[in-house]
């Protein structure tokens, strides 16, 4: 929850509150570059230590950072931009170990025949909390007037809510980390398979992940190409979308946050329907088709400035991304052993981050911030989704017949 609120609120804060989107792009570029090193190390931690303890530690880290910065804001009445950027970096670093750890933990305690159901439930849970975070971000960023106009309809409410300061939002975020810590602390689980603790040095543990993927080339190709849509989602949600809403749609923070909510609702529906529609045997075909649909939606947004169409495109992209994630993780669960999955996922992550660094470096160029030129960034995102699908297409039959290794 805290990750979702921060990841939504901070980009909009830089874009529409202090009007320093170029500075945010540079900070985002630096944070992403630093996460290259963290990503590899995080994977070795996931495979070496108790995954429950890792969850507890990262929630304490998030609580400490958010509470400290929030207190500074309350004391001084404002926050310098670099402290806001620091919170964003901290949130990204937590995000980058949270999901590899979550999936490794899920595989560890789940019977093979339940992989698809569990990955769907994880996606539903994740997107539900993100949808709630989107709603909170919309309310906290923009506030709520007692009278407002939306989609051609006038609404009258018996109350109003003022827009919150960024440090007040951070205080809410800090409390969610504390709640998460309390819930996770009480979780008890029984692993389906004994965890093979690797106590070798860092270099040796990293090499093990590379060695596995070198021996399983198809898994390496699949693991990276199937992340193409995710690559665009992260870049679009944290950097391109705030500029697009502000410069192309000429709308405010409410539209930005509702767009994210639309994305989450689409993802939530995909969480319930993906396994029923595609099944485990059609995962590769589904990922290819959904990647192309996502590409089409980016082009759709580049060619239209209607707000409702923007929400619809976000809805479909969210559904495509969630369905791809479910099918991708289920496939990897069947083909990567639990004792190495943290490191394998960290390698996929680092490669994805490398592409993201290059992409952000391009999108921070002044060209994309002149007038409505941000639509060219959407065209680039569409091309990336299409390339991911085209890489998987020639490998379709081989991937479908790839034997399970666990």
Regions found by a protein language model. Name each.
Residues 1-36, 215-263:
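Helix-loop boundary and gating motifs at the non-cytosolic
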Residues 1-7, 28-46, 50-62, 83-144, ...:
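Substrate-agnostic recognition of the 12-TM MFS/MFS-like secondary transporter fold
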Residues 11-16, 70-75, 132-170, 358-378:
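Transmembrane alpha-helix termini and helix-breaking/packing motifs in multi-pass membrane transporters
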Residues 48-62, 278-291, 373:
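Cytoplasmic membrane-interface "Motif A"-like loop-to-helix N-cap segments
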Residues 60-77, 292-305:
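C-terminal ends and interior cores of transmembrane alpha-helices
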Residues 162-166, 170-200, 392-405:
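Helix-loop junctions on the cytosolic side of multi-pass membrane transporters
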Residues 189-224:
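Juxtamembrane intracellular "pre-TM" segments in multi-pass secondary transporters
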Residues 284-324:
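C-terminal transmembrane helical hairpin of 12-TM major facilitator-type secondary transporters
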């Amino acid at each position: 929850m805290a990750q979702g609120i921060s990841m939504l609120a901070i980009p909009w804060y830089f874009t529409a509150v202090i009007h320093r989107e170029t500075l945010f792009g540079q900070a985002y570029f630096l944070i992403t570059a630093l996460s290259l090193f963290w990503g590899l190390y995080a994977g070795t931690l996931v495979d070496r230590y108790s995954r429950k303890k890792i969850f507890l530690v990262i929630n304490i880290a998030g609580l400490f950072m958010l509470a400290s910065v929030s207190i500074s804001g309350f004391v001084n009445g404002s926050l310098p931009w670099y402290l806001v950027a620091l919170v964003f970096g901290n949130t990204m670093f937590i995000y980058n170990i949270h999901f590899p750890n979550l999936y490794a933990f899920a595989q560890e305690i789940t019977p093979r025949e339940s992989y698809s159901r569990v990955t769907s439930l994880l996606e539903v849970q994740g997107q539900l909390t993100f949808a709630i975070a989107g709603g909170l971000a919309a309310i906290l960023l923009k506030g709520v007037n007692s009278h407002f106009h939306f989609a051609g309809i006038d609404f009258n409410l018996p109350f109003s809510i003022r827009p919150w300061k960024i440090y007040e939002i951070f205080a809410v975020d800090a409390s969610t980390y504390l709640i998460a810590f309390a819930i996770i602390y009480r979780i008890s689980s029984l692993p389906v398979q004994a965890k093979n603790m690797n106590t070798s040095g860092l270099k040796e543990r990293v090499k093990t992940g590379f060695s596995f993927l070198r021996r399983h080339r198809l898994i390496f190709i699949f693991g990276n190409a199937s992340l193409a849509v995710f690559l665009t989602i992260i870049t679009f949600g944290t950097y391109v979308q705030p500029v697009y809403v502000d410069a192309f749609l000429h709308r405010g923070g409410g539209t930005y946050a509702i767009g994210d909510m639309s994305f989450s609702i689409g993802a939530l529906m995909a969480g319930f329907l993906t396994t029923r529609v595609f099944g485990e045997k059609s995962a590769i075909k589904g990922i290819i088709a959904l990647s192309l649909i996502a590409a089409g939606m980016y082009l759709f947004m580049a060619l239209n400035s209607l707000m409702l169409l923007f929400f619809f495109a976000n809805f479909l992209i969210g559904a495509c991304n969630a369905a791809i994630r479910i099918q991708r993780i289920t496939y990897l669960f069947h083909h990567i052993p639990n004792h190495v999955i943290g490191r394998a996922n960290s390698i996929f992550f680092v490669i994805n981050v490398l592409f993201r660094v290059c992409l952000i470096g391009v999108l921070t160029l002044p060209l994309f911030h002149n007038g409505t030129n941000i639509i060219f960034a959407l065209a680039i995102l569409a091309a990336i989704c299409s390339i991911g699908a085209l890489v998987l297409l020639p490998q379709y039959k081989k991937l479908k017949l790839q034997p399970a290794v666990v």
